[in-house]
């Protein structure tokens, strides 16, 4: 938002210098992005008088002018403007001047054999106007001509500074000169003098054809005003022209300039349609009810004021006259109804549209205008009709407008927001004043104290709030222009702190000051992340937003997506994980092991369900090097991949049980297991289906895991698992025996290990798979495996006679239960 200091001084009486004012604005939330001194545009540009003109000896279209600029010697300047005449005052850029709009430095030059000692300028060359109608002749525009040789700054009204402010989304009132003037009045304790707005509700009710209810919401408004007998052929009022020019607004014609002027002044966009052109469009005289709002049609074309043709779709909202598009709502008007110097009758639109609808339309056509930027932040409907009436009055006074008739789509009443503000709540939130550099409090003593009621009333009244005292504090009525950000008690308290200055309040540290402690959940999560990283995994973070290729019927759709590729929330994580593996392998990585703690989202009837997952994927091999040893090549088969996951999960202190998973579309049917913790299924681990390997151009030995993170954390932080119980270190040795067997493939190694553990109690301490073989030398439905069993008695050293009965019992159980053929 660009703000003219000269314009501000018409609205508020402040005496602060520009740097001090900029500092105050920045400290109260209006960050100053840049300062521009407009007088630099007219540096070395002076008032000159053309005394004599002679033809150029070597160029038919050029003239040699003798110009008096207040120096002892007249300047000889070569000029090609057709309207240059002797006996008139002009603007002269002397040698050394820099015209920033043209990036041109004026030098002593030789033009076709004649020396030129400067340049006679047009307003376009000085960056004042966009039109190029020749040089500026002062007698045509100014009765009181400045002295010859004087600086042109005052004549050009460039004795001004432009402050560019960053306006936050919660302060749409800052998108107007009046809004910034109110802020400056408050922070500098200065008198405010604002233009009067007429809130008398004398608009007629009409029924526009609003087919799209999303554009005009409950708190929105649509009004039009008919004005005829306008003389739009002259020049714009000088005051309005100068203010628009200072803010780099193109001056078009008086009607359009008045609408732009009021948009900058009040923050309410206005748009004027040429009534005669509208009559021609629909083939009859336009009536108020002919106006409407609808969605665009796919493939519809629209030529806007910028002469560009835009392709319309149903996301874009259109203003129509008898269903014919005449504007893109809140963004830009149509070329078919544009106001020109020939316009004598207009329909003036003043409306408030929903921010979302304007944002969508603006994004779809790739155009952001001054009007759309204001609508996107939100505008109060309370001021719309009043600003429209002010525009009608200016047009009537300056351009002779007559027969004014105003219409509005609803019997709109000014809405007020009331907030209860408690004195004790202010004190408890803000604490005591430690010092004060503020205009609102006086705390010269070093003693800490709370704000008093008079100080609070003075400050809030300056903001335009109306306070009514009650037992606990005040009932505060919020003005329309602050209705978007002052809706709660805490908002008012924040406003008090913002204006007094946060650094003027005493800072209280917690007493006693205790170090922060991670909760068990966060501690386990941190340990788990570190464990995965130590085992060779890399953590990734993927986007929660996905495109329409996610065809899950339960996917949560985004109502206002920025792109079609981010139009819904993900229902799984593995799709993106497989893409990451694909990218890394395509870039030459030998292997890629990744994990992520992430959320997925689904619809469940009327509710939305978020699920916390621990997911990951592994493909290829990795080299894990250690100090003092050579790198070891790890080839990744099913059991090694599952082993890496097991090692990573061991830090949780919970046991995971694998059971074969019958079927999962994207997983290999014979190489996928369902994982259980404490008897509850928490997810799966396995090799991806060959079709997925082909789809993502990955090797077949690619593995996925997808686990319920909350269930894992719950089990890990359960008191029996979380509270570590001290166990004496064994003082007696263990004994180990191996069992090798051939058995049917229908029995998994985990089932066999479970049977061994159950049978070998109480001396069996540990069992692990140490060898596995399947191949052409064995029947297709059989497999050979070897297990190592560890026995130990905590009280004594075991001997053969202690172990033999139990070991034989295990062998018999394997023969009977799974029909195993024992090899050892």
UniProtKB/Swiss-Prot annotation:
It is an enzyme of class 6 (ligase). Pfam families: B3_4 (PF03483), B5 (PF03484), FDX-ACB (PF03147), tRNA_bind (PF01588), tRNA_synthFbeta (PF17759). CDD domains: PheRS_beta_core, tRNA_bind_bactPheRS. Signal peptide: none annotated. Mg(2+) binds at residues 485, 491, 494-495. One of its GO terms (biological process) is phenylalanyl-tRNA aminoacylation. Its cofactor is Mg(2+). Its main location: cytoplasm. Binds 2 magnesium ions per tetramer. Keywords: Aminoacyl-tRNA synthetase, ATP-binding, Cytoplasm, Ligase, Magnesium, Metal-binding, Nucleotide-binding, Protein biosynthesis, RNA-binding, tRNA-binding. SUPFAM superfamilies: Anticodon-binding domain of PheRS (SSF54991), Class II aaRS and biotin synthetases (SSF55681), Nucleic acid-binding proteins (SSF50249), PheT/TilS domain (SSF56037), Putative DNA-binding domain (SSF46955). InterPro entries: aa-tRNA-synth_II/BPL/LPL, B3/B4_tRNA-bd, DNA-bd_dom_put_sf, Fdx_antiC-bd, Fdx_antiC-bd_sf, NA-bd_OB-fold, Phe-tRNA-ligase_IIc_bsu, Phe-tRNA-ligase_IIc_bsu_bact. Its EC number is 6.1.1.20. It catalyses: tRNA(Phe) + L-phenylalanine + ATP = L-phenylalanyl-tRNA(Phe) + AMP + diphosphate + H(+). Residues 414-507 form the B5 domain. Residues 730-823 form the FDX-ACB domain. One of its GO terms (molecular function) is phenylalanine-tRNA ligase activity. Belongs to the phenylalanyl-tRNA synthetase beta subunit family. Type 1 subfamily. Tetramer of two alpha and two beta subunits. NCBIfam families: pheT_bact, YtpR. This is Phenylalanine--tRNA ligase beta subunit.
